[in-house]
From Swiss-Prot:
Described function: Catalyzes the base-exchange of a guanine (G) residue with the queuine precursor 7-aminomethyl-7-deazaguanine (PreQ1) at position 34 (anticodon wobble position) in tRNAs with GU(N) anticodons (tRNA-Asp, -Asn, -His and -Tyr). Catalysis occurs through a double-displacement mechanism. The nucleophile active site attacks the C1' of nucleotide 34 to detach the guanine base from the RNA, forming a covalent enzyme-RNA intermediate. The proton acceptor active site deprotonates the incoming PreQ1, allowing a nucleophilic attack on the C1' of the ribose to form the product.
GO BP terms, alphabetized: queuosine biosynthetic process; tRNA wobble guanine modification; tRNA-guanine transglycosylation
Root EC class: transferase
Involved pathway(s): tRNA modification; tRNA-queuosine biosynthesis
Protein name as annotated: Queuine tRNA-ribosyltransferase
Protein family (similarity comment): Belongs to the queuine tRNA-ribosyltransferase family.
Keyword Transferase: yes
UniProt GO MF annotations: metal ion binding; tRNA-guanosine(34) queuine transglycosylase activity
Record-listed Zn(2+) binding positions: C302, C304, C307, H333
EC number(s) recorded for this UniProt protein: 2.4.2.29
Subunit structure: Homodimer. Within each dimer, one monomer is responsible for RNA recognition and catalysis, while the other monomer binds to the replacement base PreQ1.
NCBIfam families, A to Z: Q_tRNA_tgt, tgt_general
């Protein structure tokens, strides 16, 4: 992987990630394909929304179908027939979200398989091996996603262990002679001094890109913005910056304003299946009875398949009848909305008009622009 930085506007960056499997224009949003599928979508449909890279889930793909089935096909690209780059998370977040059925040690994490209850062990070395078999274009280190809230002492211990696991991830990745990219993950909860230690330690180890982890886990938005404003300038300028698990459209806008290049989140797909649709002036809750006879399109400014062909009344009807097509059409729209938003942000940065774009984005939703505390 090669990262090219073209231009900046304030702290916002316009560039691209270059892989053997294709080019990803940044800032970029990555749809989530947890089980080797972006729910309800074929790879061609996902590509048609404008997505150039997707995310796969190491933990779930390890449990089902497993490494052996994956290797029979070649890798995850061959298994799911996605031709572009794939980023896989390390499995850490899923393991730590298991709560009481897992035990963290210095060596790794003991837990019970949520499918059948069998005892399983996952550590940095195993995570690197699974992601190698998946053929991930971007591999994420195995870390502990520090929960929120966490006091300073716990956050410090967690961050320090994640740094030790980062070195172990790096060592196993290198011993596998993996030619793809490896990203470090910055931890430290909402504490700036801990984030400083994490960034410094990861940069000393050396990675192809750096993710900001442990945000969007329940902390106030002001804390997320503050940490991004503090951390992003410390990440080497020639490396991509990835904000994990984020988020709402406004979170993408605010991340870009603070220097983030990459995002992923289940929100556009999950919300689509629940009838929660993102449009230029906010959100349409398609289950609301007011849409029963509405012949207008979902979003007059959207060029997606759904908006070009169907009315709000039809989408309301499909949802009321629990038709699978409704979830699919909603997903197509939400994914396209996110990609159109990213394309708009990229164009605004190119033209040096980002703050004008941001102001318009919020004004059209009747909201104020959040403060930006950067030099």
């Amino acid at each position: 992987m090669k990262f090219e930085l073209d231009t900046t506007d304030g702290r916002a960056r316009r560039g691209r990630l270059v892989f053997d499997r294709g080019v990803v224009e940044t800032p970029a949003f990555m749809p989530v394909g947890t089980y080797g599928t972006v729910k309800g979508m074929t790879p061609e449909e996902v590509e048609a929304t404008g997505a150039q890279i997707i995310l796969g889930n190491t933990f779930h793909l390890w449990l089902r179908p497993g490494q052996e089935v994956m290797k029979l096909h070649g890798d995850l690209h061959d298994f799911m027939q996605w031709k572009g780059p794939i980023l896989t998370d390390s499995g850490g977040f899923q393991v730590f979200s298991l709560g009481d059925i897992r035990k963290i040690t210095e060596k790794g994490v003991h837990f019970r398989n949520p499918i059948n209850g069998d005892p399983i062990f996952l550590d940095p070395e195993k995570s690197m091996e699974i992601q190698y078999d998946l053929g991930s274009d971007i591999v994420m280190i195995f870390d502990e996603c520090t929960p929120y809230p966490a006091d300073w002492d716990y956050a410090k211990r967690s961050m320090e262990m994640s740094l030790r696991w980062a070195q172990r991830s790096r060592d196993r990745f290198d011993s596998l002679e993996n030619k793809n990219a490896l990203f470090g993950i910055i931890q430290g909860s909402v504490y700036e001094d801990l984030r400083d230690i994490s960034v410094k330690g990861l940069v000393e180890i050396g990675f192809d890109g750096y993710a900001v982890g442990g945000l969007a886990v329940g902390e106030p938005k002001e804390d997320m913005h503050r940490i991004l404003e503090h951390v992003c300038p410390q990440i080497p300028e020639d490396k991509p910056r990835y904000l994990m698990g984020v988020g709402k459209p406004e979170d993408l806008v605010e991340g870009v304003r603070r220097g983030i290049d990459m995002f992923d989140c289940v929100m556009p797909t999950r919300n689509a299946r629940n009838g929660h649709l993102f449009v230029t002036d906010g959100v349409v809750k398609i289950r609301n009875a007011k849409h029963k006879s509405d012949t207008s399109t979902l979003d007059a400014e959207c060029d997606c398949y759904t908006c070009r062909h169907y009315s709000r009344a039809y989408l309301y009807h499909l949802d009321r009848c629990n038709e699978i097509l409704g979830a699919r059409l909603n997903t197509i729209h939400n994914l396209r909305y996110y990609q159109r938003l990213m394309a708009g942000l990229r164009k605004a940065i190119e033209e040096g008009k980002l703050e004008s774009f941001v102001t318009d984005f919020y004004q059209r939703q009747g909201r104020d622009v959040p403060p930006l505390n950067v030099d």
